[in-house]
């Protein structure tokens, strides 16, 4: 096999340069995390080797005793982190150490361009990982060889953490990766074995792999022993944290394990640890992150839990344990009932998987219910980060639809804020005695919903309306038809139906209908194919007109969403409703000039469409007609 050129100098991609700058300038106060990150990488490398070796044992190269070694050299001011995990090929070195994952590049650029994100947020979103080495080092050397490749196919990577790095081929008899940090002059504290041990205990005690260091010699050791090979000792617990009893695990240990498995810089928002025994035996440790990842809305992106079978790592991102609407959940599943060689294909049709999935969903929903009841501030944080994703739940999980519905939060006319903090239970508790429906409106924005003329009669009668403006809301209400026996009713579709709450208004409207019959005919004649119908309404108190859509047709908001996604569909025409008591309508009713009447009819329709959120097909004509009416008045 021909080798790559012996040595070459390459440039970091622009995003890596930015990330390196952030790491160097933003993490200095917490610089000891470099060791946590590099140990975590070594642990991941061992997990990958174990998994690939299930189908190709030769990858172990007669060395299946996986470890991480930490060493230091005071004279040369170096710290070395070495593992015998999967290692990397030359191409993988370039991909892993020279670029940010392609899925994250665009998002990284956008956050940098906006300059809204704190440095810590950027680091938390995209991971510190290997680059944390440059917090304490002014030069880093990586030597690596992928398992299964020849000894002369090793690679050496070197950089000072600025604009470039060099690559060359080397002989490396053993597989795995060695990272050598040449420390800055100010970082001598990390050349102390006790300091290194303290960091490992603090951040990496939970790592399943043994972390090995040379034994510290006692002060009475003989000088004769100087030339002997120092004894090694394991300096972490090296056991599966999740198999321990919950009362034996500290919160800090839970948090550090989360950071390791989720590659997150921040503490989790909440977690739940559970062991199931009986016919089916498994342990789950599930975390809810504090912040949404940059790729939350990429439904095809990597997601899922870490799968272990009898404490042996099987795979990352096992997506079959969580439904799509809970794709933000991180964690571990450790089963005693799955085969060690289970594949992603087998996960799809395995009955054990389905039972574990049901248990995982139950635990997460219970955790969210507990937060919603007992820690409203924390639940508000959860909702801000993941509420829109949870709204996908009623459509995807019929069995848990009622539990999910109880967890939903909305903005409402009850509060003068766009904060989504009203539950369906809250709404029902404030319903009028005669009221039997939950009213809502879906609009492009909160402001558009709040100012909709369709709300006028509801404000007059002090009836609460849920204000929805998330893109997912149309999907939600299409699948959530009722809650606790109360049907959900859009105020933008069909005729107004307030039951006994609108008796007086109905009587008034009936009085107007005969008197306005001729006006309605004139409107229909002028507006023609632009509308489906024109009718008198009592839902307006301040506005002259509004538009609604038929009960069984798509709302204007949903039609706009479909247009934005390029979907082909039969567009529904709006129904124009007029307020018979409004001065403008009375003026138009008495308009004898046909040209002016036509202008008024167009103006009133377009005005209603704008209030509904619609974009006018011909705004110039609208402005021209408006100006002409103003000049005539």
UniProtKB/Swiss-Prot annotation:
Keyword list, A-Z: ATP-binding, Chaperone, Cytoplasm, Nucleotide-binding, Stress response
UniProt feature coiled coil, ranges: none
One GO BP annotation of this record: response to heat
PROSITE patterns to which the protein is assigned, alphabetical: HSP90 (PS00298)
SMART domains: HATPase_c (SM00387)
Region feature (B): 345-560
Location, primary (coarse class): cytoplasm
GO molecular function, one term: ATP hydrolysis activity
Example of a GO cellular component annotation carried by this entry: cytosol
Location of region: A: 1-344
Residues covered by region (C): 561-633
InterPro entries: HATPase_C_sf, Heat_shock_protein_90_CS, HSP90_C, Hsp90_fam, Hsp90_N, Ribosomal_Su5_D2-typ_SF
Subcellular location(s) of the protein: Cytoplasm
Subunit description: Homodimer.
Family the UniProt entry places it in: Belongs to the heat shock protein 90 family.
Function summary: Molecular chaperone. Has ATPase activity.
Protein name as it appears in the record: Chaperone protein HtpG
Natural source organism: Coxiella burnetii (strain RSA 493 / Nine Mile phase I)
Gene symbol of the encoding locus: htpG
């Amino acid at each position: 096999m021909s080798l790559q050129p012996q040595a070459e100098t390459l440039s970091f991609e622009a995003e890596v340069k930015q990330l390196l700058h952030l790491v160097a300038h933003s993490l200095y106060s917490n610089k000891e995390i470099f060791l946590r990150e590099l140990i975590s990488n070594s642990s991941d490398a061992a997990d990958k080797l174990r998994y690939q070796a299930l189908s190709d044992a030769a990858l172990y190269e007669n060395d299946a005793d996986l470890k991480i070694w930490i060493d230091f050299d005071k004279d040369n001011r170096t710290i070395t982190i070495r593992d015998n995990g999967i290692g990397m090929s030359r191409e993988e070195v370039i991909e892993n150490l020279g670029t940010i994952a392609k899925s994250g590049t665009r998002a990284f650029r956008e956050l940098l361009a906006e300059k809204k994100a704190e440095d810590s947020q950027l680091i938390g979103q995209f991971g510190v990982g290997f680059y944390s080495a440059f917090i304490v080092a002014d030069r880093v050397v990586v030597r690596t060889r992928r398992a299964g490749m020849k000894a002369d196919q090793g690679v050496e990577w070197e950089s000072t953490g600025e604009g470039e790095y060099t690559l060359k081929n080397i002989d490396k008899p053993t597989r795995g990766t060695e990272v050598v940090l040449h420390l800055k002059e100010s970082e001598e504290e990390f050349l102390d074995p006790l300091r290194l041990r303290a960091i490992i205990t603090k951040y990496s005690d939970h790592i399943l792999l043994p972390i090995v260091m040379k034994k510290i010699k006692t002060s009475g050791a003989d000088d004769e022993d100087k030339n002997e090979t120092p004894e090694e000792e394991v300096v972490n617990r090296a056991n599966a944290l999740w198999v321990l009893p919950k009362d034996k695990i500290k919160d800090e240990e839970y948090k550090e394990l989360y950071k390791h498995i989720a590659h997150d810089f921040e503490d989790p928002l909440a977690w739940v640890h559970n062991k199931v025994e009986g016919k089916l035996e498994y342990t789950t440790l599930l975390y809810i992150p504090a912040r949404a990842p940059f790729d939350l809305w990429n439904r095809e992106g990597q997601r899922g839990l870490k799968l272990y079978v009898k404490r042996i790592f099987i795979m990352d991102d096992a997506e079959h344990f969580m439904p799509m609407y809970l794709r933000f959940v991180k964690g571990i599943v450790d089963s005693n009932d799955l085969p060690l060689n289970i594949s992603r294909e087998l996960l799809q049709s395995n009955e054990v998987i389905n039972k574990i999935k049901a248990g995982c969903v139950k635990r997460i929903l219970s955790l969210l219910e507990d937060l919603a009841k007992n820690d409203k501030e924390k639940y508000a944080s959860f909702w801000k980060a993941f509420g829109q994703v949870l709204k996908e739940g009623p459509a995807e999980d019929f069995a848990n639809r009622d539990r999910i519905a109880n967890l939903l939060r909305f903005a409402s006319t009850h509060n003068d804020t766009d904060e989504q903090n009203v539950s369906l239970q809250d709404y029902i508790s404030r319903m009028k005695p005669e009221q039997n429906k939950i009213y809502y409106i879906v609009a492009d924005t909160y402001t558009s919903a709040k100012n909709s003329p369709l709300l006028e009669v509801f404000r007059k009668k002090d009836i609460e309306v849920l204000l929805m403006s998330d893109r997912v809301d149309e999907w939600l209400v299409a699948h959530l038809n009722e809650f606790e026996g109360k049907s959900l009713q859009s105020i933008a579709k069909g005729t107004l139906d307030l039951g006994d709450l609108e008796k007086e208004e109905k009587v008034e409207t009936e009085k107007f209908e005969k008197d306005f019959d001729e006006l309605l005919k004139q409107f229909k004649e002028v507006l023609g194919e632009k509308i489906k119908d024109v009718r008198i309404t009592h839902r307006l108190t301040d506005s002259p007109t509004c538009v609604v859509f038929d009960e069984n047709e798509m709302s204007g908001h949903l039609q706009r969403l479909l247009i934005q996604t390029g979907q082909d569909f039969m567009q529904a025409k709006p129904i124009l409703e007029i307020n018979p008591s409004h001065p403008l309508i009375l003026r138009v009713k008495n308009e004898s000039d046909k040209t002016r009447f036509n202008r008024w009819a167009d103006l009133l329709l377009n005005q209603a469409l704008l209030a509904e959120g619609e974009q006018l097909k011909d705004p110039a004509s609208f402005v021209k007609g408006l100006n002409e009416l103003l000049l005539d008045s």
